[in-house]
Curated annotation (Swiss-Prot):
The lineage of its organism: Bacteria, Pseudomonadati, Pseudomonadota, Gammaproteobacteria, Pasteurellales. Keywords: ATP-binding, Chaperone, Nucleotide-binding. It holds the Pfam family HSP70. This is Chaperone protein HscA homolog. It comes from Histophilus somni (strain 129Pt). Chaperone involved in the maturation of iron-sulfur cluster-containing proteins. Has a low intrinsic ATPase activity which is markedly stimulated by HscB. One of its GO terms (molecular function) is unfolded protein binding. Belongs to the heat shock protein 70 family. InterPro entries: ATPase_NBD, Heat_shock_70_CS, HscA_NBD, HSP70_C_sf, HSP70_peptide-bd_sf, Hsp_70_fam, ISC_FeS_clus_asmbl_HscA. PANTHER family: HEAT SHOCK PROTEIN 70KDA. The gene is hscA.
Amino acid sequence: MALLQIAEPGQSAAPHQHKLAVGIDLGTTNSLVAAVRSGSSEVLRDEQDRLLIPSIVHLTEDQVIVGYEAGKLASQDPQNTIISVKRLIGRSCTDVQQRYPNLPYQFSATENGLPLLKTRRGLLSPVEISAEILKKLTALAEQRLGGELTGAVITVPAYFDDAQRQSTKDAAKLAGLKVLRLLNEPTAAAIAYGLDSGQEGVIAVYDLGGGTFDVSILRLSKGVFEVLATGGDTALGGDDFDHLLAEWIVKKSTVAPQNDREKRQLIEVANQVKVALTTNDKIRISYAEQNLEITRDEFNSLISGLVKRSLLACRRTLKDANLTPSDILEVVMVGGSTRIPYVREQVGEFFQCTPLTSIDPDKVVALGAAIQADILVGNKPDSEMLLLDVIPLSLGIETMGGLVEKIIPRNTTIPVARAQEFTTFKDGQTAMSVHVLQGEREMVTDCRSLARFTLRGIPAMVAGAARIRVTYQVDADGLLSVTAVEKSTGVQASTQVKPSYGLTDDEIANMLKSSMEHAKEDIQTRLLTEQRVDATRVIESVYSALQQDEDLLDDNELSAVKNALVSLQKLIQEEDSLAIKQGIKMLDQATQEFASRRMDKSIRRALSGQHIEHIK
């Protein structure tokens, strides 16, 4: 019933539908995008069923190619094929040229000293190139999820400084992607493993990617992560393992590559051998018309020096945190190179515990980011994860029918402010009661009441015309301020409350557990209540319209409308949400002609007495 239906300003007629949000692992070598679907986090695959999107951008005069196809052009046109742009983002031109003197790119500096790459498409910044990768990931996600994204959580290394973080945000903005939050990569990995679900202690995240090695030491306390120290080696990664294998192959075969294309082919062979040795004790290699064989033990000997380098970085990082390996509760493995059995073995010996490897190390960061994104957009998690964060339980407001609308979801980092607009339910309504609630259940009766106050002085209008903006603001001390403002007059009312006051951790956990145990029945109750509220709203609107314009209908038409009204009123008393929905549809059909005539009447009244030359 388009003419008579009322929706809150800025919202659709279905304000409680699932919002689409993703987690993005914007990696040096590869990037991934993940989302929570049917209650669990999963990485989204491209049309060829591939998880990893190479972080490679190829530029021509008239198009931008991202991913696998761009990678194929790297050896043919290295200057216009940008690889590992993450190394460049947020750095000065001087810094880039000093750190990476062998890059095949030509640089120019801006007035601020930031690097610009000279390409066929002109001068481009690392931010612009990163934006192309994010556009690719966004398009993939929207295609797979079937809708427009609300936003994304993008992961960054824990050691990224403000300039690098802001540059990442700028790249997302350029890509048309809303950043819900930048999340440290080690924190994302820990979330994916559920280490935020009540454990206490210190964890290490060992991240051996394609181009870099990072180690982070985190303290976990009641779901809150504190980064104690970060370290690593920006010149150590899985690519170095490939180069060592390539050197071994050349030495054994006595055949060296003669050009860039042969070098690239050799590296690809080495990479395939490395991957195969993770599950095989020995591998035959066909190279330069020769058949070679390498065992896993030989491979381990080749890479042992690099693995020791990574463990030295771990030792230095532990020292920075005033800790020893025995202080570490868990070790999370991240990055494709941590699949190598020798790496896992050495890391386990160093930290004196078995590393966590059950989640694909290529996926783990993206999966954790997706979980966080799902929380930040206010989707109710279906999993049984108890994540006790700074805001331990969601903060919401009572809406019609005794429903709870979440304003700030649990796990949100403070300080934070969120606002939402509401409207009146009845014609002439001049006051609104604001009921502040805490909890994860769908109904007011199942949540904790924090405060009530009344906003008075709302101008008398038809239902749905007034716009009341309700703002929830939590400061660094956990103090919640709630303010309601009627936008046309500026009249306002507010209250303050300490949401965590009087709640123990056990009580919080019990509230979360209760929400999970009753999730199915809560959703059913919510759906039924929403349909009843919608039906009541429509019925009141139709009765109001009949009082004003009943004369627009003949007796048969009026009888049909009243019969549909009576039928819907009876259905509201039932427990069948689908039947109520059908009843609303039947009333909609019965009132379509009535709505059209009312519109015509309003137009005639508006034009009455005006000359046609005055109407534009």
